[in-house]
Regions:
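Surface-exposed intrinsically disordered loops and tails
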Residues: 143, 283-303, 375-410, 439-478, ...
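C-terminal, surface-exposed recognition/capping segments
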Residues: 55-98, 103, 426-434, 459-544
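Low-complexity, serine/threonine/proline-enriched polar segments
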Residues: 302, 309-311, 319-323, 344-361, ...
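Extended N-terminal export/anchoring regions of large proteins
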Residues: 21, 25, 36-226, 250, ...
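Short aromatic-cysteine micro-motif
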Residues: 159, 163-166, 198-329, 342-422
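Short, low-complexity N-terminal tether/leader segments at secretion or assembly junctions of large
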Residues: 1-45
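Long, low-complexity, polar/charged, intrinsically disordered or flexibly structured peripheral segments
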Residues: 182-191, 361-404, 478-532
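Short, Lys/Arg- and Gly-enriched loop/turn segments at beta-strand edges
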Residues: 330-347, 435-443
Length: 544
């Protein structure tokens, strides 16, 4: 007679798991609780499930007046989020193929990622994984090099996280990465655990050498708080009409430990594009704002209004919620946005709505402006000009990556791993300077210097606190001319926080190599600030 085997029902197994889970939680054993939730995260089927697990774990571990947000974030990212996966990408070097398209390797093979929009939460197989799951926080750097987290997404309100007086950061696990060239291809790989040649992200280590379980990147481009202090949060006008020196001065008002944007952010953002989309550059995948350069004169004049009348065709190019200036040429002939009279009526104001109006039997589109001050307009004289976006444009995107309406239109900021990029203005890096020179053969040279301790960043000069990146010098023949080149490949830099070209040329183009431009303004000497990304209308030259 055959032996009878009684298999437990699914409900019985769930009950046993629940009992075991309750026992571990009741024990109060920190290591056991973290191991339990680590296994639950690895088994999760969606990012929403991981979000729920995070809240559950946090509530179990939080002890009012005892634990801190810093402590729990360190535990979650450093211990709970863990796996043995290796994520990678393989891309052709320009000499091998001019294609910008690579391929996923290792455990990334088969994973699918499609940028999302406000209307659609598209597939992102990476978001739920330990190495890619991300969390928004409100935080501040301290003068001693440490930092303090004041609010945490899913635990505190979004107003406290995104719109407080503090800086909004996005945290992600501090993984180990390695980048190298081999056999005509570029390889980039990421993992949770140490391995030969792998290093942690530089933004996961503070100036004291403390290595954290997470990295922190700003969620938004810098903007002004309601009190006029520079910061990083949602719903803030951009910092423009400003130089490297101006920006450093603005950040120093916030604290001596601040100086501004870091090149480390761009290096990480492009790495996320490469790992998730197997592309050498972001252009054409998540474009960012590269082609939103519009200027129109009023189709009809009015007095005491808060709007500009345009034709229907003109208004169709504008987005409600985007930023504009309103003014005229004054006594001059230039309609450049830097001319003060061009923003004398409204400066960095958002479009509140676009409505149909009929005046004197003629149909117009009224572009209504968020402003407290009414103004007069004159047909053919008053200009309305698009400007860089306020922060938070992509807050409504239903995913980690994408753009509000179209990731490929070039008309709006992009989003990668929950951080906004390319808002329509150059990003002036605080911690990098470029220096022109000439070598012994009479060729032009362009060297890069970095200062990653923002308290030591200077304005206009390279001091002993800066490090020359000896492996990154670009050389241009004495016969070359000023102008745009395109980046064939990025460099595998010794400084892991630097994004810099390995080679630029006129052979590469907007659809090949890294799909990004690099302007060459030849000089025999001189220090230059590092302007990255693009203004409103750089189109094919623009990229991370």
């Amino acid at each position: 007679m055959a032996e009878t085997v009684n298999l437990p029902r699914d409900s019985t197994l769930r009950e046993l798991v629940a009992v075991q889970k309750a026992s571990i939680i009741a024990s109060g054993n920190t290591a056991a609780i973290d191991r339990l939730y680590g296994s639950l995260v690895r088994a999760a089927k969606s990012v929403e499930e991981v979000n729920t697990l995070f809240v559950d774990w946090w509530n179990i571990c939080w002890k009012e007046g005892v634990t801190t947000r810093n402590e729990l974030c360190e535990r979650w990212f450093g211990t709970v989020l863990d796996d043995n996966r290796v994520h990678g990408t393989k891309e052709p070097l320009f000499a091998t193929s001019q294609s910008a398209i690579g391929e996923a390797t290792d455990d990334s093979v088969g994973l699918v990622c499609t940028p999302s929009t406000e209307a659609a939460a598209n597939r992102d197989d990476f978001a739920k994984l330990p190495q890619f799951w991300a969390l928004e926080v409100a935080a501040e750097k301290n003068a001693d090099g440490t930092h303090t987290i004041y609010a945490v997404e899913f635990i505190d309100s979004y107003d406290d996280v995104r719109r407080s007086k503090h800086l909004c950061w996005v945290l992600q696990k501090n993984t180990y990465t390695k980048e190298w060239d081999e056999g005509g291809y570029r390889y980039f790989k990421m993992r949770c655990h140490p391995s030969t040649g792998y290093e942690t992200w530089p933004q996961g280590t503070d100036k004291n050498g403390t290595v954290y379980g997470y990295i922190a990147n700003p969620k938004y481009a810098a903007g002004f708080d309601s009190d006029g202090l520079i910061g990083c949060g949602s719903g803030r006008p951009p910092i423009n009409y400003s130089s490297h020196s101006d920006n450093v001065g603005l950040w120093r008002k916030r604290g001596a430990q601040y100086a501004g944007a870091s090149g480390r952010l761009l290096k990480w953002q492009l790495a996320m594009i490469r790992l998730k989309y197997a592309r050498k550059g972001n252009s054409g995948t998540i474009e960012g704002c590269t082609g939103y350069n519009y200027q129109y004169t009023a189709a009809a004049g009015e007095s005491g209004v808060k709007r500009v009348l345009l034709t229907a065709a003109q208004a169709a190019n504008l987005f409600v919620g985007s930023s504009v200036i309103i003014g005229d040429k004054g006594t001059g002939t230039s309609a450049d946005r830097g001319v003060a009279s061009m923003y004398k009526l409204a400066k960095n104001k958002r479009i509140a709505s676009i409505t149909d109006v009929t005046i004197g039997g003629t149909a117009y589109k009224a572009v209504n402006i968020e402003t407290d001050t009414a103004f007069d307009t004159e047909a053919g004289v008053t200009y309305i000009s698009t400007m860089p976006y306020w922060s938070g444009w992509d807050d409504t995107v239903q995913g980690y990556d994408g753009s509000r309406y179209s990731p490929t239109s070039g008309k709006e900021p992009g989003l990668i791993q929950r951080t906004e990029f390319q808002n329509g203005s150059y990003l002036i890096l605080a911690d990098e300077f470029m220096q022109w020179g000439k070598d012994a053969d009479g060729n032009y040279t362009l060297d890069l210097y970095t200062c990653h301790d923002q308290s030591k960043v200077t304005t206009g000069s390279i001091t002993a606190d800066y490090t020359k990146q000896e492996d990154l010098t670009l050389t241009f023949a004495a016969s070359e001319k000023d102008g745009w080149r395109y980046i064939e490949d990025t460099a595998v830099s010794k400084d892991k926080g630097v994004l810099w070209p390995a080679k630029v040329s006129t052979t590469a183009g907007s659809g090949t190599g890294v799909k990004a431009g690099f302007y060459v303004g030849l000089a025999t000497s001189g220090v230059r600030a590092s302007w990255r990304c693009c203004p409103l209308g750089n189109y094919g030259f623009a990229s991370l």
